[in-house]
Amino acid sequence: MHAMWLWTLVLALVAAVAQASHVLDLTQTADYDAVVGKSAGAMVEFFAPWCGHCKRLAPEYEKLADAFAKKKDKVVIAKVDADANRELADRIKLSGFPTLMYFPPNSQQGVPYNGPRTTEALAEFVTQQSQIKSSMPPPA
């Protein structure tokens, strides 16, 4: 019985680690202000949970965060639930969802992203803006 309980615990821990996200949640204004405009650049997705386009983007954005996970000290991949934080959405002057912006280090001025919603295109944009290469293999 003890072995069965231990095995269940191990499986639960493995599942939790496997589901860990590298996308930093900055929905709280204090968290956003502590990251954006500081020493690392930040790619931020402003989303709403009910938004269909946001839901379709989520897996691509997760892969983007995975591709830059080892470079978190230089570039952060983050998200903000702008529906939950209308004050921050108003401050950024959002007009639709999802809104994707890259904030250079030490800057509150975001560069909007309007390209394809693929991991590859997003990674290329982040690399272009930050000069930081992702861990994604180059296109064939």
Descriptions of predicted regions:
Residues 1-78, 83-95, 99-140:
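Proteins that catalyze or organize thiol-disulfide redox chemistry
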